[in-house]
Amino acid sequence: MATGEALLQLPFTVNKGEVAIMLEFVQQLVNGLSLGAIYALIALGYTMVYGIIMLINFAHGDIMMVGAFVGFYSITLLGTNIVMAMIFAMIACAVLGVVIEKVAYRPLRGSTRIAALITAIGMSLFLEYMTIFLLGPQQKVFPHSAFPLKEYNAMGLLITNKDIFIIVSAVVLMIILQYIIKMTKTGKAMRAVSVDREAAVLMGISVDKTISITFAIGSALAAAAGVMVGVYYNTINPLMGIIPGLKAFVAAVLGGIGIVPGAMVGGFVMGILETFVSGYGSSLYRDAVAFGVLILILLIKPTGLFGKDTGEKV
Amino acid sequence: MLQVKEIDVYYGAIHALKKLSLEVEQGKIVTLIGANGAGKTTTLKTISGLLRPVSGTITYKGVDLTKVLPEKIVALGISQVPEGRRVFAPMTVMENLEMGAYLRKDKKEVQQDMELVFERFPRLKERRRQLAGTLSGGEQQMLAIGRALMARPELMLMDEPSMGLAPLLVREIFQIIKDINSRGTTILLVEQNAHMALSIAHKAYVVETGAIVLEGSPEQLMKSEEVKKAYLGG
């Protein structure tokens, strides 16, 4: 259940005035930003992996789930704070992502895309049910002690420290990502490989290493999102990656799959849309609307908001 | 410097190169001419490791290139200007040049080399922050050449650098190739424009359906009736 709904009980009496309507609107926007930041972080991994090996990594949402569990155990067993939990989760999932690519996807690199896609779905199910096998199917409550809830009332707007934590850490991670992609040699190599793998090899760039790095970064971002989901919804479970994973996939397609800024914008749009649908319509419709967006974008502009209509690259 | 000996290369079921042999001597411009589909690009791709021969050897300074990973071949001093330029379109001119120097650790000298490329190609300097995809064909070719130079190659493989360019530009590009060679870089040049290629080469090979059918000095080949008929439009 979305916390967005709980937050709907606004701390002021709605007097049907314009101010209240405006406030409610801004409040929904704030709620949507947190959720959107989470979707954006997951969408980034989808889009980066697609950009470099043209594979929709359907196990990506489940990597997020593993990140949430690593964060959970880091807090409950090791007693770390939330930031350290996030860092541990990111490291663990970076390794996991690299291993998954090496074991499951690399051997299929020369084969058809559908073979790789089916393998990705298999990997997704493997992660979900392996986690159930190892840790049980029950949901776990993300410890409140790790993140005591504080609420701030700013000019009638209710903002929690959760929102601030999620938005700030997501923005910091996105800035770091942009720095890596734009400014570092590794990031430039990633872009070069995604544009033209053969030409990149001729520069002396190791394609295998670059793809590994891409999986590591994408999975680390998913792990951070996983910990955020734990904070945001309070509970985690082995199947928690499915729906956010799919919605982040929609976000990546909405922004233009393979386009990094597109994934960020797409994530925020999806998060805000979802809270608005829940807030003004009914939360029953929010998933339908999310996937309705996918259908619409595929019908109207399959290359996404940021995509150029160049057709398939050959 | 480079010996290609009796290589056989397949594209799936197609026998693309049939016992093809050629030799590139240090300091020279060697050209490989032939019609479309004769196997010129395949030869270059096999040397740079993108394709592997099923038999035969490729020896560069005593190293068997067929056993070296393609991304390591650059480190041995071989860089390539690929067919169709293949610049990284959504990256800037400077970023493309940086990619050419990807394996180099000497940051300062890389910077100096970039200045040298800009000296050679002032058009690129003007456009150094522009995306490579926005450049004209000629400028992209210059960028592809500049990018290959950034690796400080001893041997440069050039695949149809004149393709799709206006005659004036073609002349300019060939002048540049000659100049690069005069500064010590050995060049293996693949061309359909046989006339231009023969005018600057020291040695030439004619390839037809995957095999060398003629070789010799450019003067000899220019006189050959076969070459005249098939490639020089005479």
Feature-to-residue mapping (PLM):
Chain A
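Cytosolic-side transmembrane-helix boundaries in multi-pass membrane proteins
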Residues: T3, Q9, V14-V19, V103, ...
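Membrane-interfacial amphipathic/re-entrant helices at transmembrane-helix boundaries
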Residues: E5-I42, V70, I82-A85, S111-A116, ...
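Membrane-embedded helix boundary and interhelical linker motif in transport proteins
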Residues: V30, I52-V99, V103, L108, ...
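Helix-loop-helix "hairpin" substructures at the membrane interface of multi-pass membrane proteins
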Residues: L35, L157-I236, V260-V265
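Short, non-helical or kinked segments that cap or interrupt transmembrane helices
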Residues: A37, Y46-A68, I82, G110-A115, ...
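Transmembrane alpha-helical segments in multi-pass inner-membrane proteins
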Residues: Y39, G79-I91, F215-A222, G226-G292
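Alpha-helical transmembrane segments within multi-pass membrane transporters and channels
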Residues: G79-M123, M130, V265-M270, K301-P302
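Transmembrane helix-bundle core of multi-pass membrane transporters
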Residues: P107-L108, T112-M183, T210, F276, ...
